[in-house]
Regions:
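Conserved active-site alpha-helix within GNAT-family acetyltransferase domains
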Residues: 122-149
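C-terminal "cap" of GNAT-fold acetyltransferases
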Residues: 148-213
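Conserved acetyl-CoA-binding loop-helix of GNAT-fold acetyltransferases
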Residues: 89, 95-108
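Short amphipathic alpha-helix that is part of the acyltransferase structural core
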Residues: 1-47, 51-53, 189, 193-201, ...
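Functionally engaged cysteine thiol sites
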Residues: 21-27, 86, 159-161
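A conserved beta-strand-loop-helix scaffold within acyl/acetyltransferase catalytic domains
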Residues: 33-58, 62-82, 87
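A short, internal acetyl-CoA/4′-phosphopantetheine-binding micro-motif in the GNAT/acyltransferase core
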Residues: 85-95, 121-123
C-alpha cells in the first residue's frame, strides 16, 4: 500500500482567511490582540507586510513574517531591503525541509529585493532566531553585532544581537541599524525575545555589557 504524501500549503494571512487571527499570535503564545501589534499592522500591511503560514495536513506547523525595511518593527534601514521578523517550524514537523520551503517562498515573492536582513541572537537563553540557525539553514551572514544584557531579567547574562544579511545581487548595499534604538527593545510582537513590556517605565530595557561595572 502506497503511503499517502503529506499535503503542504502556504497561506498569506494578510490577504484575509479563516486563519487571520494568526496575525496576532504564534506558536510561542496564545491569541492576544494587543494594541501595539494592532497599531503596527495598520501601518505595516499597506506597506508590504506579509505573514505566511505553512499548513501540513490541515494543521498550522510553520510561519514566516517579513516586510520592507521602511515598515519593519526592527530599527533596520536599507534600500530595497526585506526584513524577516521571524521564521518558525514546530519541532514535530521537522525533517521535511519545511523551514526552507517557507524561506524560499519569501525569496520568490521578493525576487526584486536587493537583499534580506534579520536579527539573530547568540548566547541568549531563548532557542529562537539563533545566529547559527540563520547562517547554516538560510545562508545569512553577520555584518555587525552588539553585546548587551537585559535590565529586567537574567541581568547577569550577556548575549549578542547580530544584524544578519543575505544579498540578492552582487552590487547590493548592506543594511544599517540603529543600535541605540534597539536598546529600547521591540513592541510589535509579544513573543519576540527582545520584546519591550508595555508596563515597564524604563525606556531602554537593554544595556551594553561593557558599560556595566
Amino acid at each position: 500500500m502506497t503511503e499517502k504524501r503529506p499535503e503542504v500549503k502556504i497561506l498569506d494571512v494578510t490577504e484575509g482567511s479563516e486563519y487571520q487571527r494568526w496575525l496576532y499570535t504564534c506558536f510561542a503564545m496564545s491569541f492576544v490582540k494587543h494594541e501595539k501589534r494592532r497599531e503596527y499592522l495598520v501601518r505595516a500591511i499597506p506597506k508590504g507586510f506579509h505573514k505566511k503560514l505553512l499548513i501540513l495536513n490541515d494543521e498550522v506547523v510553520g510561519q514566516i513574517e517579513y516586510v520592507p525595511a521602511e515598515a519593519s518593527g526592527f530599527p533596520i534601514v536599507g534600500d530595497n531591503v526585506i526584513v524577516m521578523h521571524c521564521i518558525w517550524v514546530l519541532r514535530k514537523a521537522k525533517g521535511h525541509n519545511l523551514g526552507k520551503k517557507l524561506f524560499h517562498e519569501m525569496l520568490e515573492n521578493k525576487r526584486s529585493a536587493s537583499g534580506f536582513a534579520t536579527l539573530a541572537l547568540e548566547n541568549h537563553w531563548s532557542p529562537w532566531m539563533k545566529r547559527w540557525q540563520m547562517e547554516k539553514l538560510f545562508g545569512f551572514k553577520s555584518i555587525d553585532s552588539m553585546e548587551v544584557r537585559h535590565r529586567l531579567k537574567q541581568m547577569r547574562e550577556c548575549f549578542e544581537i547580530h544584524l544578519m544579511w543575505l544579498p540578492n545581487r552582487s552590487d547590493s548595499k548592506p543594511p544599517r541599524w540603529d543600535k541605540t534604538k534597539l536598546l529600547e527593545g521591540v513592541d510589535f510582537c509579544l513573543a519576540h525575545p527582545l520584546y519591550h513590556p508595555a508596563k515597564t517605565r524604563q525606556k531602554e530595557i537593554f544595556e551594553k555589557c561593557q558599560s556595566i561595572v
